[in-house]
Amino acid sequence: PELIDLRDETRSTLDMYGVGRKDLPNAGRGGGKNVFSNFSTNCLLARRMVERGVRFVNIYHASWDHHSNLEKELRYNATMADQPVAALIKDLKQRGLLDDTLVVWGSEFGRTPLGENRGGRSANTGRDHHPFSFSIFMAGGGIRGGQVIGETDEVGWHAIKERMHINDFHATLLHLFGFDHERLTYRFKGRDFRLTDVAGKVANKLIS
């Protein structure tokens, strides 16, 4: 109960996260009642959990599946997410918590750089699922910030430079958590197996 009681937070902190802010009109598919304020509150609660020693916090933001109405949907979700996510990172840093907290913002795949206009959907163009190039941002927790790693082709269809496989990403996370991913290897039927598979490598360029 104490954790979710925000009465001890200053007005400036609540405003920084956007707690109490109004939803945008003409909601996207992720719309509902008070979703902007609710997501802001969730980000603030994440900081409060970290302060109290919670080891893993998952903030879920839904409805980025923009197969149609891209302009409206993307503006709605980005406006909902940008302020409180930035506030969370700033707040963690101001309180001396960011160096020991790894912040990861990502999803399971990206979106196509070219438009999608499939039958049965709105006539307004959207984007389809795209596993061949997408980005994740990371902050704090041993990350060397202020850099962009990797590059796509000219249209954003394929990653072509400094590509990071998901196994490399997992190996890097484990390293940041203090685990040597190669020590998690086991042998079965003549082959080595591990969480990061045998090709996964730590992305040292990411690490401070």
Name every feature range the model reports, one short phrase each.
Residues 1-208:
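Ligand-binding pockets and gating/stacking loops
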